[in-house]
Amino acid sequence: VHWSAEEKQLITSIWGKVNVADCGAEALARLLIVYPWTQRFFSSFGNLSSATAISGNPNVKAHGKKVLTSFGDAVKNLDNIKGTFAQLSELHCDKLHVDPENFRLLGDILVIILAAHFGKDFTPECQAAWQKLVRVVAHALARKYH
């Protein structure tokens, strides 16, 4: 994947302002609420019975932060995203059997959350760079499935 200097700048400038704990929790909660079938991968998380329960669930918050923290590894390693996610791809494929489509859904949700959080700063050019990034990350995570 080739990243232009502008794309890299747009991604890193937004990433530098992201509250990983808040945005991560919000992204995972939104995934579980908007796409309820994804909840089956989180049966050990306790109460996921309603949007309020999901949003307030400490396990959802903790895992959301973990997910977005690892997303930060992609931002730091834009030129080696495949390598960066090789082990996570293996874990999600071989052990957890996560549907790779879920990675794409979560990426799209992350873009929505960034747009909501950053408003006018999240320009169409910025969105394009982030959309490319979440696609590349989703593809890297799904790599073990191919």
From Swiss-Prot:
Stated family: Belongs to the globin family.
Protein name as annotated: Hemoglobin subunit beta
Binding site for heme b: 63, 92
GO biological process, alphabetically ordered: hydrogen peroxide catabolic process
SUPFAM superfamilies, per database record: Globin-like (SSF46458)
Pfam family, one: Globin
InterPro entries for the chain: Globin, Globin-like_sf, Globin/Proto, Hemoglobin_b, Hemoglobin_oxygen_transport
Function summary: Involved in oxygen transport from the lung to the various peripheral tissues.
Gene: HBB
Keyword annotations of the record: Heme, Iron, Metal-binding, Oxygen transport, Transport
Tissue: Red blood cells.
Subunit structure: Heterotetramer of two alpha chains and two beta chains.
Gene Ontology molecular function: haptoglobin binding; heme binding; metal ion binding; organic acid binding; oxygen binding; oxygen carrier activity; peroxidase activity
Highest taxon of the lineage: Eukaryota
UniProt xrefs under PROSITE patterns: GLOBIN
Residue ranges of domain Globin in the record: 2-146
CC terms in the record's Gene Ontology section: blood microparticle; haptoglobin-hemoglobin complex; hemoglobin complex
Organism of provenance: Columba livia (Rock dove)
